[in-house]
């Protein structure tokens, strides 16, 4: 063993992981604001030029469309909980954490009709240096949520 061993530079990894830890807290606050139906607090977490790709489309939508979509969910459902939250760092092409947050969890909702729904959820959020969400990508079975409501109403 030589005294002149190369020491790996982990500064980029450490910096990315620190950004992830900060942004993970912001992601959690965003979900909590949705659950509390505090639309203004939730929207404050997003940059004005944020791009939203909801689960039922491949479109890149605006912050105004996000507000409209979240208003719809908050209007249709009495209550939500987001269980089993798991947060993981997103990575760049070299597998270095880039500050983005990958979120897994299970949404449980009570529809205005009284029907309950359960849906697995995955998202990726990217943040700017001000700690605002600039990109929000979501995946879950939107149709399945409303199929659950419909099947309970038929019984």
Predicted regions and their residues:
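A short, structured loop/turn motif at beta-sheet edges
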Residues: 92-99, 112, 126-132
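Short, low-complexity N-terminal intrinsically disordered segments enriched in polar/charged residues
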Residues: 3-36, 40, 44, 155
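Low-complexity, intrinsically disordered terminal/linker segments enriched in charged
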Residues: 134-155
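Short, cysteine-centered beta-strand-loop-beta hairpins and adjacent loop/turn segments enriched
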Residues: 59, 108-118
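Hydrophobic pocket/interface hotspot
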Residues: 30, 41-43, 50, 66, ...
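A solvent-exposed, acidic/Ser-Thr-rich amphipathic alpha-helical stretch
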Residues: 39-93, 97
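Short, surface-exposed coil-to-beta transition loops
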Residues: 102, 116-123
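A short hydrophobic beta-strand element
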Residues: 97-107
């Amino acid at each position: 063993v030589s005294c002149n061993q190369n020491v790996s530079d982990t500064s980029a990894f450490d910096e990315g992981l620190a950004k992830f830890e900060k942004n993970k807290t912001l992601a959690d606050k965003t979900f909590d604001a949705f659950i509390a139906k505090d639309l203004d607090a939730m929207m404050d977490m997003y940059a004005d030029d944020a791009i939203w790709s909801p689960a039922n489309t491949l479109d890149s939508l605006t912050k105004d469309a996000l507000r409209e979509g979240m208003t719809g969910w908050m209007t249709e459902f009495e209550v939500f909980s987001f269980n089993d939250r798991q947060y993981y760092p997103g990575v760049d092409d070299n597998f270095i954490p880039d500050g983005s947050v990958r979120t897994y969890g299970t949404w449980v909702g009570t529809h205005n009709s009284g029907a309950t729904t359960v849906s697995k959820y995955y998202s990726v959020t990217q943040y700017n240096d001000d700690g605002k969400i600039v990109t929000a990508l979501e995946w879950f079975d939107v149709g399945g949520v409303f199929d659950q409501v419909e099947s309970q109403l038929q019984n």
